[in-house]
Amino acid sequence: MVIRSEHRSIDAVLHGMQYLVNEIRTRKSKVDARVFSAMLYYLDAFPERVHHPKEDRYLLAPLRRDPAAKALVAELEREHALGGQALRTLEQHFIRYQEGGDKEFAAFGDAVDEFARNYWEHMRKEEERAFPIAEKVFNAEDWSAIDHAFPGDADPLAADRNTEDMQKLFSRIANLAPAPIGVGPRVR
C-alpha cells in the first residue's frame, strides 16, 4: 500500500530529528538549525497538508462502513485534527531553542521525542489496526481511489518526487543534514 511508503518517508524525518537531537544531547554537537527548519517544514507541507487529508478521505471514510471500525476511525481522525497543533507546539519549542540557546534545548529535545513517539504510535495504529480492516472491507473502487489519490502526492522523500518545490526541499534536507541522515557537514 502506497500509504506505507509515505509513512516510511515521515518515519525517516522523525528518526533524523531524533538523531540530531541525540547528537546534541550526547556529544554537545552543533547542528545547523536550517536542517531542523527544513524538517519541520516537511512535516507541515507534506503529512499535515497532503497525507492526512487524503488518509481521511480515502482510508478512513470508507472504513466507516465497518461498524467495528467506527471507534478506531474516530480516534485516527481526532489525531489527524490535533496533528497541526502538535506540530505548532514543536515549532514553538524550536523557536525558543533558537532564540534562547542551550538553556532551551532540553525542552526542545523533549518535544521532539514526544512528537516522534506520538507520531509513531499513530502510524502504528493505522498500519496494524486500520490497514487490516481495509484489506477485509475495501472493494475494488476503494483501492482504485487510493491508488489514484496517493501516487500523485508531492512527497519529497518518496520514490516519486514529482514537484520542483518538493524536490528542492528534499535536496535541502539531504544537503544540510549530516551523515548518516544526509550529505551535509559533520556535526561538531
What are these regions (language model features)?
Residues M1-R188:
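Small-residue-biased structural context
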